[in-house]
Regions:
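DNA-recognition helix of C2H2 zinc fingers
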Residues: 107
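Generic hydrophobic, amphipathic alpha-helix propensity
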Residues: 22-23, 70-75
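Alpha-helical bundle regulatory/interaction domains
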Residues: 1-35, 39-51, 56-65, 79-104, ...
Length: 129
């Protein structure tokens, strides 16, 4: 009944490629600025687009909001450090190194994402669980 025009298919693919490129730029920015708070406006300026465009790109490519995506990137980075089980790392230092400055918020988000406290992840990695 309704057919997509060839033009809309091509523009959709171009948009998808540019959205994927933006998400890669976000990933690089987050990795480089892991210890700092990440603000959408700064990220958008760095990528040369609006905050809305960043949000649309993340929603299109990752299926979630920009804010949620950024938080999950930080949480996964923290988990990767905790899983290594280094004696030099604490949960607090790991949280701060990944942009979390409110330990209660970090604890709540970590438990919600990984179904265990960060301290248990670290203890298991060290073999003391």
């Amino acid at each position: 009944m309704f057919r997509r025009s060839r033009k809309s298919e091509i523009s959709g693919r171009i948009a998808s490629k540019s959205y994927c490129r933006l998400v890669r730029m976000i990933d690089e920015y987050v990795a480089y600025h892991a210890a700092s708070p990440i603000y959408s406006a700064d990220l958008a300026e760095q990528c040369g687009v609006s905050v809305r465009t960043l949000g649309t790109a993340v929603a299109s490519v990752r299926g979630m909001s920009l804010h949620r995506y950024l938080r999950l990137k930080q949480l996964w980075s923290a988990r990767a450090q905790l899983v290594k089980g280094s004696d030099a790392i604490t949960v607090t230092s790991c949280a701060r190194a990944n942009g979390f400055h409110h330990m209660g918020e970090f604890a709540r988000l970590y438990r919600a994402a990984f179904h265990e406290p960060a301290s248990r992840t670290l203890a298991r990695a060290r073999g003391t669980d």
